[in-house]
Amino acid sequence: METEDDLCNTNWGSSSSKSREPGSSDCGNSTFAGFTSQQKWEDASILDYEMGVEPGLQESIQANVDFLQGVRAQAWDPRTMLSNLSFMEQKIHQLQDLVHLLVGRGGQLQGRQDELAAQQQQLITTDLTSIIIQLISTAGSLLPSVKHNMSTAPGPFTGQPGSAVFPYVREANNVASQSQNNNNCGAREFDLPKPVLVDEREGHVVEEHEMKDEDDVEEGENLPPGSYEILQLEKEEILAPHTHFCTICGKGFKRDANLRMHMRGHGDEYKTAAALAKPNKESVPGSEPMLIKRYSCPFLGCKRNKEHKKFQPLKTILCVKNHYKRTHCDKSFTCSRCHTKKFSVIADLKTHEKHCGKNKWLCSCGTTFSRKDKLFGHIALFQGHTPAIPLEETKPSASTSTQRGSSEGGNNNQGMVGFNLGSASNANQETTQPGMTDGRICFEESFSPMNFDTCNFGGFHEFPRLMFDDSESSFQMLIANACGFSPRNVGESVSDTSL
């Protein structure tokens, strides 16, 4: 047998002998500390970043690592990120095995190829959607820590020359500086697609929503001073039900177009093209062009008021009315469905009532959305948030499955596989029945999350279990039936949510 000294000399060769004094037989030389940290993931030395870091940056990076360790729990942790990535890798492997299983079972069931193909495609699509959502959630968890590091941490984290940790921050600083210079010259603001910007001169993070106003979506024009005329209406004129009045009969109208249509009834002279034309639409040839009209809010201190240092004018009278009512008036219109939301503009109430009570997209935090893209945008911003199913949709299915299961207690006939995505009250019920002879797979909702309990990564629970998670996944049920495992008793699983 070879001695320990011989093994060390054989494995490491001349590189080990050069870094070691003659006569030394220690195999745990500090030269290979970086290699040891790569082999042991749980070792705390992985945070030292000893691999591939220049000696000049070692102290600076170590100072930033110590700073990150003292940040709140929501700060980015590389070990947690590694756990999350390994978690999703395990789920992808499970889905890959499921696809292999479906390919192998393709020739066993004849006569129902179209039905099985649609069901298998829906199964794979829902599991892929679950994986994508977890990936978006993991990426979204980096946003709070990146914003905190750019605003407070010095050194390589602020995009200085020689930065080795966040090199893209330097580009954001350059863009932010260019945007600030353009604003000083009166040019249009530069809107980044990024959620955060870094201001080098003031040293703080500027969020994207601070650069826009919620009242005017068409904002973006920066007219030079003197190129437009500022008009300011009084409060009584803004809140008046009618702003245009007939000079003959005195009838009031909300729009000037309605007034022009009304004037046709007072004589033929009001039916000409000149009388029906929009005012100030055509300028007289040879005359100077008229100044553009912009409007000011009469409320002092408002950003839309002409006395404000960052004055932003309103384009039309309708914009003035809507802005003043939304910002400076009481909300007197209440939704007749939810009796919770209040609005000051009747148009906003009508828009809300179109989807009120139909928020079928629910997040695990309890927030509801009327559109799926809004839900996914919310999930991408908040760590650990995942789609859920509204309780009002799952309660009837839970009661139906319980009644159906009690009536089929001893029946061992042809069964089917059902995916129960109900609420927490029926989360412990099994959703399988023995046999898969007809190959039917039933879906109650669009999401069928896989079983997350099959892989445990050192106690990290970055993706909390939702209230609709079942104790058995679609992948496990298909494996059990395909491998010929003994089916469970019908008395234990009495739920069928396919009908």
Swiss-Prot record:
Q: What's the domain of life for this entry?
A: Eukaryota
Q: Polar residues: which segments have biased composition?
A: 396-415, 422-435
Query: How changing residue 27 to G affects the protein?
Result: In strain: cv. Est-1
Localization annotation:
Nucleus
Look up keyword Transcription regulation and say if it applies. Answer: yes
For this record, an example GO cellular component is: nucleus
Write down the SUPFAM superfamilies for this protein, in alphabetical order.
beta-beta-alpha zinc fingers
Gene3D superfamilies (UniProt xref):
Classic Zinc Finger (3.30.160.60)
Q: Could you cite one Gene Ontology molecular function of this protein?
A: sequence-specific DNA binding
Give the UniProt keywords, A-Z: Metal-binding, Nucleus, Repeat, Transcription, Transcription regulation, Zinc, Zinc-finger
Q: Where is this region: Disordered?
A: 1-31, 390-436
Map the zinc fingers (C2H2-type) to residue ranges. Answer: 244-266, 354-385
Recorded hits in Pfam families, A to Z, give:
zf-C2H2_STOP2_3rd, zf-C2H2_STOP2_C
User: Where would you say this protein principally sits, based on its record?
Assistant: nucleus
Q: What induces it?
A: By shock H(+) and Al(3+) treatments.
What is this protein's tissue specificity according to the annotation? Expressed in roots (e.g. root tips and lateral roots), leaves, flowers (e.g. stigma, sepal, anther, and filament), stems, siliques and cotyledons.
Q: Changing residue 10 to N does what? A: In strain: cv. Est-1
- Give the protein's function: Probable transcription factor. Together with STOP2, plays a critical role in tolerance to major stress factors in acid soils such as proton H(+) and aluminum ion Al(3+). Required for the expression of genes in response to acidic stress (e.g. ALMT1 and MATE), and Al-activated citrate exudation.
Q: What is this protein called?
A: Protein SENSITIVE TO PROTON RHIZOTOXICITY 1
Organism listed in the record = Arabidopsis thaliana
Q: What is the lineage of its organism?
A: Eukaryota, Viridiplantae, Streptophyta, Embryophyta, Tracheophyta
